[in-house]
């Protein structure tokens, strides 16, 4: 449908934005694709040379990712895992990418997730959140009237200023600073990217 087309275009623009914030050459780097879905970003990271841990709560999406990419040369660099991004104990990463996954947590849980991930990350975290705006609130309300197949999973919008204040006040993120930000808004897809960079 037309709705799905605008969502697909928006997601593609957001995916390209987040990927552009990571180094072109990721050889020897460990990257977490948090909430990897069907692994579209994971395979792009692997093509850049990264060793990727790709985690998602959905077993069916992980199975689909394994089926889709098992014949590709880069597949051996990706470890697809069914599980919670907050419970990867003992792993260390150079970068974390979380596209449209933290947006499903309420604000406090989203912040706690970033704090938990930050403990195991050496360089940067790039992620998206649903910005609390009047147009998004209106779309959210209107969206409830669409057929279930056209509806997006539940999201938890947060005002950018509130998120920035929460990040600034977090005792767990004192070594991190906010880098780039970018909002994508195409029809029924609205999401905002943010970069957190660990200070040297």
Give residue ranges: language-model regions.
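Short, glycine-/aromatic-enriched active-site segment of Class I SAM-dependent methyltransferases
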Residues: 136-153
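Class I SAM-dependent methyltransferase SAM/SAH-binding core
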Residues: 40-84
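Conserved beta-strand signature within the Rossmann-like core of class I S-adenosyl-L-methionine
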Residues: 122-130
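A short, conserved alpha-helix within the catalytic core of class I
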Residues: 105-116
């Amino acid at each position: 449908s037309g709705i799905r087309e605008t969502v697909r275009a928006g997601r593609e623009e957001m995916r390209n934005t987040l990927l552009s914030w990571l180094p072109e050459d990721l050889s020897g780097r460990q990257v977490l694709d948090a909430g990897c879905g069907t692994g579209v970003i994971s395979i792009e990271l692997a093509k850049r040379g990264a060793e990727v841990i790709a985690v998602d709560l959905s077993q069916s999406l992980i199975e689909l990712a394994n089926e889709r990419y098992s014949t590709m040369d880069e597949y051996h660099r990706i470890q697809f895992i069914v599980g919670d991004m907050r419970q990867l104990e003992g792993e260390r990463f150079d970068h974390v990418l979380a596209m449209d996954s933290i947006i499903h947590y309420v604000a406090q849980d989203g912040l706690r997730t970033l704090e938990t991930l930050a403990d195991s990350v050496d360089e940067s975290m790039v992620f998206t959140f649903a910005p609390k705006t009047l147009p998004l609130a209106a779309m959210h309300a209107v969206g409830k009237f669409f057929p279930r197949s056209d509806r997006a999973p539940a999201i938890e919008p947060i005002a950018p200023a509130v998120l920035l204040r929460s990040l600034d006040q977090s005792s767990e993120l004192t070594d991190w600073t906010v880098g780039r930000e970018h909002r994508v808004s195409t029809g029924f897809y609205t999401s905002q990217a943010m970069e957190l960079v660990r200070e040297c």
